[in-house]
Amino acid sequence: MLRLLMIADDFTGALDTGVQLAAHGIPTQVVVGQADLSACSSTVLVVDTETRHLPAAKAAKAVEELTRSAVENGVGCIYKKTDSALRGNIGAELAALLKASGARNLPFLPAFPQIGRTTKKGVHYIDGVPVNESPFGIDPFEPVRCAEVTKLIHLQTEIPAQNLRPGETAADKTGILVYDAATAADLETAGRQLFQNGTPPVLAGCAGFAAFLPELLGLSDGSVVETPQLDPRLLVLCGSVNPITLRQMDTAEKAGFTRLRLTPRQKLEPGYWASADGKAALAEIEQMLAANPHCIIETNDAGGNQLTADYAAARGIDLDGMRVGISGSVGQMFGALFGSEHLGTLLLTGGDTLLQCMNSVGARELEPVCELESGIVLARFTYQGRTRYVITKSGGFGQEDLLVELADRIAKH
């Protein structure tokens, strides 16, 4: 029976939140796009609506339709998963959930203190820095312009939104209620307060608060899923421009990872990987994988992305066209390489990259297994009758030595 519906706006976010329940042995399914809630056999269903880059009205419509379906099918709790750095259509999607559910209010707990993302006096911080002054404020595709959460919400909706401090009750309030949380304990306290009179019909937040849902919903039996043995060879496929991920790759390269940067043509020329030059490049990549146990293939140019920007400008490709074109090309490359005997464990970073790579091998559903580190998810899917594993990561997650530490951990497990 479906007990919990989670609605995410990108693939990596769907996984890093769904795994908070799957890691406790709770049957959890992650799907992209449309979902038949009446036919779902999992206890938890996470739907990635792929609305992060859509216009606000279209994003709201997708969330509203899914919410109405959940209400009609008697789903007890709906959780709107938001980005922990507040990217995407936050106000529009929260308003759509509240409106379609018919609930009196929507408790919103945006913090993820476990990885340094906190909300204090209504302002959202990344490692102590207001989010709009952090790397997320200069994201080329979706910069976060405002750190005051209620103001950010009101950029897209007129529904009332107010900030709640630790200890304040939501019982007599209406609209979107933004909770402060500087620690995981703050989230836990807020959760216990919210659930003391039964399960709230709607909630919103990221993986930080979702970590407490197994206990709050009475779904956890105390079990913990063990990490399966993985192929010690590691290929990192990076489509993220986040400075955090760039530093992780620099650190890994210094530690001995082999690093390949795709050229502007490889990233943006339609059909490149099916061309003679593309096939030759794929053969060279296979040779690289055969000769090196730890490899990185990335979409960033050395020293910035001006080369790719110039290439795109000369061909009339705008910023969104670059984003779609690059992720699509990476997906095509991934599909061509996927059957290689030299391919070991995969780590995909960036939601667009993950989606296109999974599309290329026909995997529209993933099952989260466990977290290797906070925000770093191990998931599995079936390909030609075999279980395959993939590690997924949002571009903004992890310490600088993350890739090196993961490679060591996989090799020793």
Give residue spans per PLM region:
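A structural-propensity feature for long, helix-poor, extended segments
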Residues: T43-E50, P293, R380-H413
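Conserved, well-ordered active-site substructure
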Residues: L343-L402
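C-terminal structural cap/anchor segments
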Residues: M288, N292-T349
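Short beta-strand segments
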Residues: I7, V46-D48, K80-K81, P107-F112, ...
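N-terminal short beta-loop-beta anion/metal-coordinating cradle
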Residues: A23-V44, L289, P368-T387
